[in-house]
Curated annotation (Swiss-Prot):
Disordered: annotated span: 1-20
Annotated keywords: Cytoplasm, Ribonucleoprotein, Ribosomal protein
Organism superkingdom: Eukaryota
Pfam families from the UniProt entry: Ribosomal_S3Ae (PF01015)
Main localisation: cytoplasm
Molecular function GO labels: structural constituent of ribosome
Compositional bias per record (Basic residues), positions renumbered to this chain: 1-18
One cellular component (GO) term of this entry: cytosol
UniProt-annotated location(s): Cytoplasm
Family in the record: Belongs to the eukaryotic ribosomal protein eS1 family.
Name this polypeptide is given: Small ribosomal subunit protein eS1
Subunit structure and binding partners: Component of the small ribosomal subunit. Mature ribosomes consist of a small (40S) and a large (60S) subunit. The 40S subunit contains about 33 different proteins and 1 molecule of RNA (18S). The 60S subunit contains about 49 different proteins and 3 molecules of RNA (25S, 5.8S and 5S).
């Protein structure tokens, strides 16, 4: 039997001398700012690795997409079924300025709308806003029973469905093409388009639960900082401090210090 070192005993554990590095030590937190169309402007924070060499932190943040519930943006629990997508467009200091990048409904809300004895009608249209955004709007609506109707069901005929769908497309196209993205988003929140469709189609067949259920941005115009600042409106004013009057005691102390120095 050969006498010598037992390599297995003398060797320590592999990788035991490795230092544990905190992954957050090389990262920074940035505040996410929502457009001025929403009530709550500061919606949260996001992480990004610090600037190292050619890797710039602000470039890593741009075009990140955040999904936020409209209930949090408006401080209104009744709007919890809408999900708003916001895309990071620019970084100013520790603030990430975002813009609208789409909207959708929660699955449970959509499932709760579908019921028996009624007809579901859907429509979609591609439309361009005045500021150059190409959007695809999806609309959903349901038939309802006429006043004093005895019959349980309220199914619409195929010809009526076609007429209603035509009206949906027409109203969505008119509403979206006549305004910019900021104005259009302000129409989605109180469901202006859905109410107009209900009113316009009442002569064909009465509708209920008419919503623009989804908005997709297909194409965005070239980035313009001026337009982004317009969308954020009073963002610049928020960071400006207000002038405070100096207390009389502090003024007296300051006078004594000046006298002592002389």
């Amino acid at each position: 039997m050969a006498v010598g070192k037992n390599k297995r005993i003398s060797k320590g554990k592999k990788g035991s001398k490795k230092k544990t590095v905190d992954p957050f030590a090389k990262k920074d937190w940035y505040d996410i700012k929502a457009p001025s169309v929403f009530n709550v402007r500061n919606i949260g924070k996001t992480l990004v690795s610090r600037t190292q060499g050619t890797k710039i932190a602000s470039e890593g943040l741009k075009h990140r997409v955040f999904e936020v519930s409209l209930a949090d943006l408006q401080n209104d629990e009744d709007q919890a079924y809408r999900k708003i997508r916001l895309r990071a467009e620019d970084v100013q200091g520790k603030n990430v300025l975002t813009n609208f990048w789409g909207m959708s409904f929660t699955t449970d809300k959509l499932r709760s709308l579908v019921k028996k004895w009624q007809t579901l009608i859907e429509a979609h249209v591609d439309v361009k806003t005045t500021d150059g955004y190409m959007l695809r709007l999806f609309c959903i609506g349901f038939t309802k029973r006429r006043p004093n109707q005895v019959k349980r069901t309220c199914y619409a005929q195929a010809s009526q469905i076609r007429q209603i769908r035509r009206k949906m497309v027409e109203i969505m196209a008119n509403q979206a093409s006549s305004c910019d993205l900021k104005e259009l988003v302000s129409k989605f929140i109180p469901e202006v388009i859905g109410k107009e469709i209900e009113k316009a189609t009442s002569s064909i067949f009465p509708l209920q639960n008419v919503f623009v259920r989804k908005v997709k941005i297909l194409k965005a115009p070239k980035f313009d900082l001026g337009k982004l600042m317009e969308v954020h409106g009073d963002y610049a004013k928020e960071d400006i401090g207000t002038k405070l009057d100096r207390p009389a005691e502090d003024e007296a102390m300051a006078g004594q210090e000046v006298a002592a120095a002389e």
